[in-house]
């Protein structure tokens, strides 16, 4: 019996835990963990809106849709916009740590400010160029393919400019991949707060008033709904390259050669 208990103890004691003593490693794993959690909430809701929510709403009777929409979208938008903000803020801190490590390895720690400044400027300009392409238009201006091609060109150009500006012999694949993936995520955050939330806030209010007080929907409601749908669909498609580059940061070092 004693031998059996001893053997069992040896088996149970096999796992060995050794937590890193480096506080930077602990901070990074906590940042990545939070980034994953809130990113899943954000992108999960984005996919729900585009793959399930919007198509289902179109098939519902007006009376049912009017009662369901304010209740569902109020809760969904709270989670959607705040999880987006937390995801990006946590991601920016992690990105800054990657930049700082590369700058330290290059022998010029001040490079972190230049790299981050370039990154922020390029993606802000990219969003300013993308923004008008999301407005509902007429004819060719409201063609999905035209809109998709224009936005794709802007995003690709922005990504290439960031790679050129941030390239260097000590620049890591994680630095370059997150510069692109995080940049696209930043565009999505600006759309979440700058378009989708602004539109949905008004549509929720108008729909609730229409159901509870019989107030007719304003004439601009249809245009705003279309604008919000386009912005949400743009975020949906941007999420695919965003997720690829974020995953490639740690698991697919194909951008390191650009910095060589």
Residue spans for each PLM region:
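Polytopic transmembrane helical bundles with strong interfacial aromatic enrichment
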Residues: 2-260
């Amino acid at each position: 019996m004693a031998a059996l208990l001893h053997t069992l103890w040896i088996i149970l004691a096999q796992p060995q835990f050794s937590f890193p003593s480096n506080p930077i490693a602990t901070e990074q794993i906590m940042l990545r963990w939070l980034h994953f959690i809130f990113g899943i909430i954000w992108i999960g809701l984005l996919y729900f809106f585009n793959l399930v929510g919007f198509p289902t709403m179109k098939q519902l009777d007006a009376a049912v849709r009017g009662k369901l929409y304010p209740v569902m979208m109020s809760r969904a938008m709270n989670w959607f916009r705040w999880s987006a903000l937390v995801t990006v803020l946590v991601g920016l801190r992690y990105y800054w740590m990657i930049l700082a490590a590369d700058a330290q390895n290059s022998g010029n720690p001040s490079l972190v400010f230049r790299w981050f400044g370039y990154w922020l400027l390029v993606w802000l300009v990219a969003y300013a160029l993308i923004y008008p392409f999301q407005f509902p238009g007429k004819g060719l201006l409201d063609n999905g393919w035209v809109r998709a091609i224009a936005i794709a060109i802007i995003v690709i150009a922005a990504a290439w400019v960031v790679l050129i500006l941030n390239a260097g012999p000590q620049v890591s694949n994680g630095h370059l991949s997150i510069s692109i993936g995080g940049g696209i995520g930043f565009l999505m955050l600006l759309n979440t707060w700058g378009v989708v939330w602004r539109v949905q806030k008004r549509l929720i209010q108008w729909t609730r008033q229409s159901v509870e007080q019989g107030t007719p929907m304003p004439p601009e409601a249809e245009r705003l709904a279309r604008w919000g749908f386009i912005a949400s669909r743009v975020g949906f498609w941007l999420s695919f390259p965003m997720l690829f580059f974020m995953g490639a940061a740690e698991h697919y070092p194909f951008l390191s050669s650009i910095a060589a």
